[in-house]
Amino acid sequence: MAYERIDRPKGLLYHYTKRENIELILQDGRIRKLRDTECWFCASLEDTLRLMELTVMEEGKLYYDTNGLPRRYPKFIPEEYVVLELSPRYQNGDWVIWNQEFPDGAPEEIQKLGEEFSHLKIGFRGDLRFYENPNIYEVAQLLQEQTQAPQITM
């Protein structure tokens, strides 16, 4: 893993979480890094949904948790997830992106996917405070709207 410091993002940030976490997050007024070094966000709803496609929507796929232990993604239930649209409050801390590193000879397709994955996420080193009353989007509804949008093909 290679972290790269970036400028503080401008505008809104998006963070997906399980519905069961919402009450505590709203009471707390912050997204906590928990066992990680950073808490992670996306710059748009579209990026958030794509990140979810590459992670929590990959039922049964292997990943490594924050303790470095191998795990498998459980069955994805869209109704269990929400996306918070956040206005960050000013605070000190480093903003980073995480650049996936690959061994020499890694297939180009895998490298491109890793680059996309790395640039979907924006990390904040610390707990990110946000202004009250963030918009909360239902992931099930977002996915339904996404599939109903007309697809233009050429």
Where do the PLM segments sit?
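ADP-ribose/NAD+-binding catalytic cleft of ART/PARP-like enzymes
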Residues: 1-40, 53-56
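Short, solvent-exposed loop/turn segments at secondary-structure junctions
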Residues: 21, 46-48, 89-91
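Short helix/loop capping segments that flank catalytic or ligand/cofactor-binding pockets
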Residues: 24, 49-51, 94
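Aromatic-enriched hydrophobic runs in primary sequence
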Residues: 38, 44, 84-86
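Short C-terminal domain-edge/linker segments immediately following a structured domain
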Residues: 42-47, 120
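Short active-site loop/helix that positions an aromatic residue
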Residues: 45-62
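Active-site and NAD+-binding cores of ADP-ribose-processing enzymes
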Residues: 59-154
